Every structure is written in C-alpha cells, then in structure tokens.
Amino acid sequence: IIGMKEKSRVSQYDVVYHSPGKSDRSAMPLGNGELAVSVWMDEKGVLRFYLARTDAVTELDRTVKLGMVEVRTAPGFLSDGDFIQRLELEHGIVHMKSCGKELWIWVDDASDIVYVSGRMKQEMKVKVRYYTWRTEKNLPWNSPVRSTGLTEAADMVDELEDRICFRHINGENGIEHLARLQCVDDLSCVPDLLSGRIFGGIMYLEGGRRVGHELVKGECTDFCLKVATHSAQLEEKEWLDRVDGMLKGSRTADESREATAVSWEAFWKKSYIFVEGDKERKPVCNERILDCVSEPMECTGTASPVTRGYLLTKYMLACCKDGNFPVFYNGMLFNLCPGNREHLGVMEFVSGFTRIPCGEYPTLSINPDERSWSNEHLWQNLRLPYYTMLATG
C-alpha cells in the first residue's frame, strides 16, 4: 500500500513550467481514460486545449480531435515574470498561477466533462470560444479511400443563448469498399462502428451568455467552464438530449475536483516503482529531438530519470486507456499539429518534433488530426503504449 512518503515522491515528479508556451508543443496531458485533453497557455495569456476521445472516429475511420477551446481573460492572465504551470500528477490536474490569478483544468473522473475553474483577486471578464478546422467537407491528403469519391462531412456548430454545441455527424463510409478489396462478400460479419456515429459536445460557461461566437461572463472574480463530450451511434436529437443531460447532472467544480483528486490518488496507490541510483544517467534520446525541447521545464526534486519516465508514461496511458475504443497509435490521444506546416508522412522523421509553431490556429489541411503512419492498427503504430502496458501489468 502506498503511504504518505510514496505519495509525496509521486509529487516530486510533477512537471513545472515557468513561462508560457510558443505553440501546442507546450501542451500538458489530462484525461479520465476516455476523454483526453492537451492544454497549454500561450505567450499572449490565452488558455487553449484540444479535446480527444478514443471513439471520435469519422466516416473514413480516422480518430480525430473534437476541436479546440480557447479561454481569454480581460485584463490578460499573464503578468511579467510571474507565471507557473504545474501538472499535478497525484491529482490529475493542471494548475496555473500568475499574479493573483489561478486556473485549474481537469477531466472529471466519472463523466466525460472537462472543467476549467478560475479565481482572480480583481474582477475580470472571461471569454470562451470553440474552434474547429473541419469547416467544409474534406478528403484527407493521405486517405486510403481516395479512389472512392468519399469525403468527411464538415462539423456542425450551434451557437445557442448560453452554450455552444458542436458535433460531427458521420456520412457515407468506406466499410463496404474496403471489405470488397479484402474479398469479403458477407458484410454482416464486418462490425460497423461508423454509420450514424455522432461525436462532439456542449460548452457551457456558468453565469455567462453568448455574445457573437463566444461565451462571455462579465466582471467576476471566479468562473467555471464545463465542456461535456459524447460519441455514439444515435439519432441526432437523442444524442443532443444525452449530452444536455450530462451537463444538467454534472457536479459542481469543487465536487468534481475533489472527487477526481481522490480517484487519481487511488490510482497511484495500486502499484508503484521508484528507482534510485541513476541520477546522473543521461536520457536515451536522439539529440536532435532533445534540442527541440526549449520549455523552461523542471521536475521538482527529480532523483531518477528512469522513475520520471516511468511515472509520466504510466500517467499518460491512464489518461486514455479505458475508453470505448482501444488505445490507438503511439501518440495515443495526444498527437499535436505537424511542425513547419509539413505533412507528417512526407517530412524527415525528426523534424516532426520541431518547436517551430504551426501557426496560431490549425487549418483544414494542417491540423492535429494528422498521424504520420496512417490510421491502421498496425504493430508499429501501437508498440509504444502496448509494450508499456504489458510492462506495468
């Protein structure tokens, strides 16, 4: 059983930033097993995060993001020389502080809802916006069904009085085409997990209202943003009712944060490994990849690079390994935008880790939906998470 000493040792490996990021390469991971979030604070003081689910799968069988959320405060969140961002491993929370302003971001342990809670010493205005780059029907550049004429439908966004609803509704898919290519004539034996699938969510800012394309809360010293997500093969109205019900039945921010922290503490109690005697060990990693890491990052009290790697990998796996669909791809649900505005499949391998920002916003052609080794569950696309899961029992 893990005791207080071991719990404090987990916290020693919290990841800490002392300045905001230059791009989504600065993102920290969060998740509850199904819903995963990549969150970062940019140099303008804007909080951004991607949403991802294991079962957010398009009609072309691509595992994609649900979109991106942006949170702004006025006055801005950042103050010169006073910023700290911590990934609290023990509690599964990202905590940011800057001169009397604090943000907490987490994924609820019992429902697929992202919470962003803020507290400020002085009154501020809060603005929240949802972005999707799938704004028109599209055929991804490396799609294996290019010859069929199939495309992915555009996402739908409804801007309501006090919330924003976003979703992707799968259109015609390529299951029959791909089955024929494999000489499978009896389609009844081929599971269809794509037809009629809807994935997305509803974004709600407590005490706020919609102004233009944003949810806005006037002068306030605290706020709570909830983003409820869902994916299922349902009729559209039933899907909307289900997500709306998730919001109505959701916990308060304090209840959710406390329960989620307890859940993560229980996770770390199940098993643990702490290695000693390797403090001087150099990371086994391509130097050109290490050169791309320019964040002023620290792991407080890190005594063991091996332990750090083990704990951080175990944490990331826990964020997305218990979903409706299996863990997919080496990057799991935390893939980011390609660097240099180059498609991943045609660039030199190491340049995929570039720190050069892809631009402020993803586009229809360059976005974090992209994966360099296509979408199949091939061994080379799965070896990193599954080897690790085997090693951790």
Predicted features by range, described:
Residues 366-374, 378-379, 383-390:
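Zinc-dependent metallopeptidase catalytic helix centered on the HExxH motif
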Residues 310, 317-318, 382-393:
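Carboxylate/His-rich catalytic cores and anion/metal-binding grooves
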